[in-house]
């Protein structure tokens, strides 16, 4: 996909999943804080410029040149969905579509306390993960974004319910997917749905909005991912 031109958006179109159209979350303070989608998108583009992260823009080859960014909450709670995933693309020159979803970018407390890997839980490292995903099936069950290329994770192996960001890193194919939580209910608690994957809380948003977007934007290609921290936003 095309590298950013450096231009900042002058207008952001409002979508049915922007902050103003979504009820306040009980546990996700970060989600509630991101009221103005236009300001959020401008801030993400500023961060991308400062850190030399890619911002994909519309072009002839990619009419929907999708950007997916995760924002990890500064909260250490891993029981509830307290992070967000932002999906945005340039619909026309400097006219952007921006959608923000409640999510987790961390393993849940249950998986941290009882990791499935003897090295410890995989916590996706913040930064750019180029061509991380492709469309596939999560655990062979339903359409999702599945890991297509190796990535770097942090191994958290002290078996408490808090995320520990250390230098204990690992690199490889770990099944770090982007998928939904429950297929039949929307719960505030992560449960066992994340052992390191990026997980969208709301199955209705997943089925009605996200999967159709993936089909149009990604197809048989790959999708990069940027993960930052709430503190990067300087809110």
Regions found by a protein language model. Name each.
Residues 11-18, 23:
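N-terminal compositionally biased, intrinsically disordered segments and leader/signal-like regions
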Residues 1-14:
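Short, positively charged low-complexity motifs
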Residues 20-191, 205-212, 219-223, 230-232:
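Cell wall/extracellular polymer interaction/catalysis modules
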């Amino acid at each position: 996909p095309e590298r950013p031109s450096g231009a900042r958006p002058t207008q952001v179109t409002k979508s049915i999943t922007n902050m103003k159209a979504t009820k306040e979350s009980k546990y996700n303070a970060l989600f509630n804080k991101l009221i103005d989608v236009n300001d959020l998108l401008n801030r993400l583009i500023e961060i991308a410029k400062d850190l030399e992260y890619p911002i994909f823009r519309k072009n002839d080859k990619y009419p929907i040149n999708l950007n997916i960014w995760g924002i990890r909450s500064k909260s250490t709670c891993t029981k509830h969905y307290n992070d967000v995933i932002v999906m945005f693309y340039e619909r026309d020159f400097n006219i952007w579509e921006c959608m923000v979803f409640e999510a987790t970018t961390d393993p849940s407390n249950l998986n941290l306390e009882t990791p499935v890997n003897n090295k410890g839980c995989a916590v996706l490292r913040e930064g750019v993960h180029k061509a991380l995903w492709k469309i596939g099936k999560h655990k062979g069950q339903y359409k999702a974004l599945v890991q297509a290329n190796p990535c770097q994770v942090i191994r958290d192996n002290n078996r408490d319910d808090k995320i520990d960001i250390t230098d204990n890193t690992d690199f490889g194919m770990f099944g770090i997917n982007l998928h939904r939580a429950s297929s039949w209910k929307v719960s505030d608690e992560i449960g066992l749905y994340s052992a390191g994957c990026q997980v969208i809380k709301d199955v209705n948003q997943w089925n009605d909005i996200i999967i159709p977007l993936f089909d149009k934007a990604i197809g048989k290609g790959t999708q990069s991912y940027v993960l930052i921290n709430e503190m990067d936003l300087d809110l």
